Each structure stands twice: as C-alpha cells, then as structure tokens.
C-alpha cells in the first residue's frame, strides 16, 4: 500500500471538485496507461502482460497522488450490450425439460433388475460414472434425488478395500475405488483413504505397466482426482498425488492428441482448488463421449451431452441479461469516470457465473460482481491514490455508516462511499427478507472490520513499520475482503442461514479463518513484487523474511506456498467433515468463492492483469455458446 502525505487537512477538503471534474483532470494521466479496451466493434482485444510503474502526479489542489498504471476495462460496454443469443426462445427450455425427463428415466433404470445399469459385474461403476458425468457436465442440479440414491447404493457395498466394478465383481478395481472415494467423500459419506493401500505392491508403491493402455491411464486419472480431496495427515493421498502426477505427465508424452490428452492436461493444470465448475463443463463438453473403455450405450451419452449443451446455452442467455444489467449499474454510479482504478466487474461476474449456474441465483452472481468491484476500487484508493488524511476520513465515514458522512470526504471518494452504502444496504435488506433476521447490522459490522484492516495497513506504511508475519497475517485475513464478498451474496441464495449456522461458515469460524488465510497468502505470493515496486513493503513474503533473517526470497515464497498447501487440506476437512452440523452445500458456497480467488492468483495477480487467463475464461464461459 503506497501512501504519500498530503498538506495538512483542513475544511477545504470537504469542498473538492465533483467526481466527474476530478476524473476529467486525470484523463491526461490515464492516457499514459496502455489502452487495452475492446474496440467499439467488439472484434478484438489487445491483451498485455506489462504493468506500468506507480507514477507520482500533482493535481491543482497541490496534493501529490500516485496511480498504479493498471490496464483499462477490457470489455467495452457497447459490446456487452450487443451480446446476442437465440437460446432465449421457449422451445429450447421445453426441449431441455424433455431431455431432463429422459435422463431421469435412465437413472430409474438403475433400480430395474438386470437392466443396463444393474449388472452385478458393473452396476457400481455405472452409477458412479453417471453421477460423475452429470456433475462435470453442469447438469447435476436436476438430479439431486437420483444422485443420492445412486451413491447410497454404492456406499452400501463399500469395504475397507474399496469396491469392484460391480457388487459381485469379487475383485476391487482401482478406477471404481478411486472414483468412489472422491465422489462419496465430496457428498459427505465417511470413506477412508486407506482403501488405496490395497493398490500398492509389496514395496508399498503404486506401479504401472510398461505399456500404458487407455484403460490404465483413466484408472490413474481418477486416482489423481481422488488424491486432491485430501485431509491433513493422509500420507497415502500425498503418495497417490505424486505417483499419478508423474504417471500422467509421462503418458502425455506418449499418447496422441485426443480428448483424453486434453482432459489430462486440464486436470493437471487446474486440479480441484482452482477448477471452476462452468470452466470444467466447457472443457468436458468437448471431450465427453470419447472414453471407449467403458461400455455405456451411445444413446445415454448423447442424451447427457445434448442436455449439457442446452443448459450451457440457455444459461448463456441469462448471463447476457445479467451482464447488461451489471454494466448499466457500473455506468449509473459513475465508475467509468474513476480512471485511476481497475475495472473488473465483468471478470468478477464471470467468476461468480462459473460457480453458480442455477438461474435462481441471479442475486448471488450480481451481488458478487458488484461487491468485488467496489472492493477493488477501495483497494486502489487505500493502496495508491488516497492520502493518509483522506483515508482517515473515509474510514471514519464507514464507521458512521451514514450518508451525511460524505460531506467531509474529497469528492472522488463521495461517489464510491455512496455506492458501497447504497448497494450493501440494498443487498442486506433483500437478504433480510429471505433470512428473517437483521442482516443489515451484520453486513455493516463486517464492512467496519474490513475497512479497519485497510486503515491498519495504511498506518503501517505511513510509519514505515514492517509487522511480524503473524501480525501481518491476522490483519491481512480481514483486509483481503473474501469475507464480505462471500457474506451478502450467500445470504441471497434462498436457503435459510440462521446465525447459528452462519457462524460455522462466517467469522469467527475455523472455516472462515482458513479461507481468508489461504487467499491472503496465495495472493501475496503473486503480488508482493509489484507491491514492493510501489513502495508497499508489507507482504506475507517480506514479513516471513523479517522473522527469519538470512532466508532467501525464493525460500520464503516456497514456505508460504507450503503453508497454503497445508491450509488447503485443513479446509478440505472443514468442508467435508461429517460432524459439523452444517450441510456441505451451505459451506460449498464459501468454498467455491475461495476457489474463484485461488484461480485468479494461479499464474499472477489476475485481478490486476486480467488480459490473459481471465479474459479467456470470460470468452469461453459467458461470451461464446457451444454448438448443438
């Protein structure tokens, strides 16, 4: 957080220029930043990996300010407004509903004696394959009852050695056991990872044949997927991940380009914690049906694929309307005039759409996009643009939580403050209608804590103080903002979240503490160099180096990444532990938001440099449809 001291604050500060006048003066400054926006015709985007250094500037009020040189909004609002789709027609919804009925009939066949899914030599694997397929194709919300019935059947035959392909197979099967371990664990069933011990040789090692067949490769691929759902202390899962990763990388060097190789590359790259459901669905639609090792009737595969494509494209038509609504909101609040800040509202909305594809969850998607965008504006104010005196005023205004507080704010802050005040109150009131308790006060307290963490960092920078690692992390878990990006959108989802249950997900729960710590640490490993270049010394890496004199920067980064890995296993346990008293589906919302930000920091600070991976994500998941 780079701060500069301003001239002594006086009453004239409350009589600054209007937001738009102030913004106009900044346009000359902003012109030095590369223009990466989508062209008016919406035909191209010019991505850039470069970031200009922080620049000191002086305005007519004599206050030196700094801007970080972030690239501009990538998505021209006219292009968003012109997004078109033919899938709004009722005929597509009617067709999808018809196919849903047909797929339900396929699930029903599982209970028919000697049916296609009930052979005693393959019924368990058939059921697991069906559940896994509808989940990866993004259509599982239509089949909750059928999924539960299928998994109950599989679990009834689960043993300490795993399962075979069928209830009468007699021999355990790696593919079925690995897929079962993963799927059952994710649905809250108690299953031990020790089942994998039975697939090691006498030396305690996983082995493979000299000739890697497609069937064996798929066995190991499911072993890899299972190994990622690891709990703390599960050495067998660590060994399985190491073995399967090595095996699959070796296989990629030998097999020709195919749907299988594409799937392997995708899963090795994104694993589980950076794998967003709609992103995986888009990949899986392309490769589904190419598995020739498992005898499933062609018609069943075609029905699942048809439904997946229909649902993907129908949801696309809803996304179009929601994005247009979000863009209007962005313009109505004057955000385009704030030219010193990042504008990532389209990207944030896309990330929400990638984890919440139920049409009923529009308030969640839009709420996440709005809150995340406003946090980004505040981040750029507190990090670079605001003076210490102005930040004290803004912090005091948030503590008052009153529109009259803007009277003593610089005008460039007034619009931002009112946007936060209006939108958080509006979301909280809507959530209160759903939840039946005072969510407005709850939201206000969470924002006070968030802003308090921001000003604490500002004071550290202003005084030149570098905190200890523990001191930094405790504050950083709050200043990252993941709690407030989760809280209000989650309360609008329609299911009851009484305070008793919410406290198991939100602050001060272990679950919340883990998600906030993971994101703060992961974010810092990608941001600390750019932050340091702007004079923002405090980061998890720098503070760890302070606490451990003589350690190299590379080793410090490795240590922080190791912490993230360990905390991630703890988070897996908090999500899936059977004795929590909170449904997994409730915690999964907060967990998926953690995955969203984890994805954003996978390669770099993807929220500052959004012109590479996240730009491609927007294109693949919300701009383009899939051919039927």
Swiss-Prot record:
Pfam families: Terpene_synth (PF01397), Terpene_synth_C (PF03936). One of its GO terms (biological process) is terpenoid biosynthetic process. A motif (DDXXD motif) lies at residues 379-383. The keyword Lyase applies. It catalyses: (2E)-geranyl diphosphate = (1R,5R)-alpha-pinene + diphosphate. The Asp-Asp-Xaa-Xaa-Asp/Glu (DDXXD/E) motif is important for the catalytic activity, presumably through binding to Mg(2+). This is (+)-alpha pinene synthase 1, chloroplastic. It comes from Pinus contorta (Shore pine). The gene is TPS-(+)Apin1.
């Amino acid at each position: 957080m780079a701060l500069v001291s301003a001239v002594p604050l006086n009453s004239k500060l409350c009589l600054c220029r209007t937001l738009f006048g102030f913004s106009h003066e900044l346009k000359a400054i902003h012109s030095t930043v590369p223009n990466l926006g989508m062209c008016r015709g919406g035909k191209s985007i010019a991505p850039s990996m470069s970031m200009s250094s922080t620049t000191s500037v002086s305005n007519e009020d004599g206050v030196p300010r700094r801007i970080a040189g972030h690239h501009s909004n990538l998505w021209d609002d006219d292009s968003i407004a012109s997004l078109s789709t033919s899938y709004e027609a009722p005929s597509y919804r009617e067709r999808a509903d018809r196919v849903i009925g047909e797929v339900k009939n396929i699930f029903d066949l599982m209970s028919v004696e000697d049916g296609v899914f009930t052979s005693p030599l393959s019924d368990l694997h058939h059921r697991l394959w069906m559940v896994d397929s509808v989940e990866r194709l993004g259509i599982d919300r239509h089949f909750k009852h059928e999924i539960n019935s299928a998994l109950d059947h599989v679990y009834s035959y689960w043993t300490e050695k795993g399962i075979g392909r069928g209830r009468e197979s007699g021999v355990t099967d790696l593919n079925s056991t690995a897929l079962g371990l993963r799927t059952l664990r994710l649905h809250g069933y108690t299953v031990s990872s020790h089942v994998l011990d039975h697939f090691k040789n006498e030396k305690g090692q996983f082995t493979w044949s000299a000739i890697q067949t497609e069937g064996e490769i798929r066995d190991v691929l499911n072993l890899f997927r299972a190994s990622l759902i690891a709990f703390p202390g599960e050495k067998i899962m660590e060994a399985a991940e190491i073995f399967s990763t090595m095996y699959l990388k070796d296989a990629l060097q030998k097999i020709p380009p195919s749907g299988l190789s594409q799937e392997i590359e995708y899963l090795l790259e994104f694993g589980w914690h950076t794998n967003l459901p709609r992103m995986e669905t888009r990949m899986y639609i392309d490769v589904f049906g190419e598995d020739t090792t498992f005898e499933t009737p062609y018609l069943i595969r075609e029905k699942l694929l048809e439904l997946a494509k229909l649902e993907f494209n129908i949801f696309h038509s809803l996304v179009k309307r929601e994005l247009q609504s979000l863009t209007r909101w962005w313009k109505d609040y004057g955000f385009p005039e704030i030219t010193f800040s990042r504008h990532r509202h389209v990207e944030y909305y896309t990330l929400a759409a990638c984890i919440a594809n139920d049409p009923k969850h529009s308030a969640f998607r839009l709420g996440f996009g709005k809150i995340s965008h406003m946090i980004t504006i505040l981040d750029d104010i507190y990090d670079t643009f605001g003076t210490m005196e102005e930040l004290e005023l803004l912090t005091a205004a948030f503590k008052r939580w009153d529109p009259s507080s803007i009277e003593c704010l610089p005008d460039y802050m007034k619009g931002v403050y009112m946007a936060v005040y209006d939108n958080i109150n509006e979301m909280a009131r809507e959530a209160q209608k759903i939840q039946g308790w005072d969510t407005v006060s709850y939201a206000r307290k969470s924002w006070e804590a968030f802003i308090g963490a921001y000003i604490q960092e500002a004071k550290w920078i202003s005084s030149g103080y570098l905190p200890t690692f523990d001191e930094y992390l405790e504050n950083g878990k709050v200043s990252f903002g993941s709690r407030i990006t989760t809280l209000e959108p989650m309360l609008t989802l329609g299911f009851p979240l009484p305070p008793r249950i919410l406290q198991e997900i939100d602050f001060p729960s272990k679950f919340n503490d883990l998600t906030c710590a993971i994101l703060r640490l992961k974010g810092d490993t990608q941001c600390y160099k750019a932050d340091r270049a702007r004079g923002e010394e405090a980061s998890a890496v720098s503070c760890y180096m302070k606490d451990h004199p003589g350690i190299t920067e590379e080793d410090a980064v490795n240590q922080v990444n190791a912490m993230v890995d360990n905390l991630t296993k703890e988070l897996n346990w908090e999500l899936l532990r059977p004795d929590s008293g909170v449904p997994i589906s409730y915690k999964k919302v907060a967990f998926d938001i953690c995955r969203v930000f984890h994805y954003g920091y996978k390669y770099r600070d993807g929220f500052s440099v959004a012109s590479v991976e996240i730009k491609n994500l927007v294109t693949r998941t919300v701009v383009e449809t899939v051919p039927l």
